[in-house]
Amino acid sequence: MGNCHTVGPNEALVVSGGCCGSDYKQYVFGGWAWAWWCISDTQRISLEIMTLQPRCEDVETAEGVALTVTGVAQVKIMTEKELLAVACEQFLGKNVQDIKNVVLQTLEGHLRSILGTLTVEQIYQDRDQFAKLVREVAAPDVGRMGIEILSFTIKDVYDKVDYLSSLGKTQTAVVQRDADIGVAEAERDAGIREAECKKEMLDVKFMADTKIADSKRAFELQKSAFSEEVNIKTAEAQLAYELQGAREQQKIRQEEIEIEVVQRKKQIAVEAQEILRTDKELIATVRRPAEAEAHRIQQIAEGEKVKQVLLAQAEAEKIRKIGEAEAAVIEAMGKAEAERMKLKAEAYQKYGDAAKMALVLEALPQIAAKISAPLTKVDEIVVLSGDNSKVTSEVNRLLAELPASVHALTGVDLSKIPLIKNATGAQV
């Protein structure tokens, strides 16, 4: 019995021993392998990239200048079966750090040997060539270990005697001089070229502006023509649409008028039927009862008229009879009064002044009553006089004025009656 072992692409599995013989070895990476119990051995080795930083301090160059050089190398174990077998023979069972130390010492040795064959300028100014030379020299040695150099670069080169800085200053001065000359020449050429470019630019710009203006004018003209044509077509289409709409509206209106005529005819027929029905209904519900009521009222009015006529005739007859009776009474009373006045006149004529005196005396109380009527509202009359002769004279004055008052009131002149004349004359 045994186990199935798997391994990723960053590792290699080494299976040794087994049923096939003690010298059988199987190398697997990124797959699986079968290992028997007790008689098979399985080990793993890393295939990942290892980063090394070789450093050589104070190594003399071909000119005897001590330099310190540092670099960066990327290495890994190769996966070809023969080279992987070589690497496993040398590094199987060791950790990654042990492998890195072996390769690092090899690279540093080759780096030192190459530094002794080159000048400072070659090392400093052409680092790529220096790194390429180190990689070419060291590759066979590390290859025999099953190691592949993926990349090698020079990280830094410096010295402790300022050789590189002095070399740099001289070179910098030369470069600065050449740079100033180059800048001046470049500025001169740039100014000339700039002026030429500006001229060319302005020429091109003016030509472009002219072409743009021409194109714009042509565009506007074409646009105006198109717009005019579009407006004409639009107006024609709009007019055609409006005419067609007017025709359709006219047709619709004609149909509506015909529908309205038909509806009106139907409505007139319905209204005629309704009028007939209403007329019949009015005749049945209003006219006939109204005629009956009018006939009844007419009969009642005629009866009332006859009644009123008869009553008026009776009342007139009554009034006439009463008038005749009253006229007879008045006539009799007038005749009696005339007879009485006649008799009184005959008596007054017969008795003369005595009769007139009796008539006056008969009227005096009434006259006195009329004269004294305002005095009825007086409770007491006080005559203030200290002399009795004055009161007497006042009474005589009143009596003297009496005939004039009677004559004014009755038209009878008392002064012509002897008795009154004598009485008033005696008082005077």
From Swiss-Prot:
Lipidation positions, renumbered (N-myristoyl glycine): 2
Post-translational modifications: ZDHHC5-catalyzed palmitoylation may be required for the formation of higher-order complexes and for neurite outgrowth in cultured neural stem cells.
Lipidated residue numbers (S-palmitoyl cysteine): 4, 19-20
Tissue occurrence: Expressed in many tissues, including suprabasal epidermis, hair follicles, heart, lung, thymus, spleen, liver, kidney and brain. Not expressed in skeletal muscle.
Gene Ontology terms: biological process: anterograde dendritic transport; cell adhesion; negative regulation of amyloid precursor protein catabolic process; negative regulation of gene expression; positive regulation of canonical NF-kappaB signal transduction; positive regulation of establishment of T cell polarity; protein localization to plasma membrane; protein localization to plasma membrane raft
Known function: May act as a scaffolding protein within caveolar membranes, functionally participating in formation of caveolae or caveolae-like vesicles. May be involved in epidermal cell adhesion and epidermal structure and function.
Family per record: Belongs to the band 7/mec-2 family. Flotillin subfamily.
Protein name: Flotillin-2
Organism placement in taxonomy: Eukaryota, Metazoa, Chordata, Craniata, Vertebrata
Protein's gene: Flot2
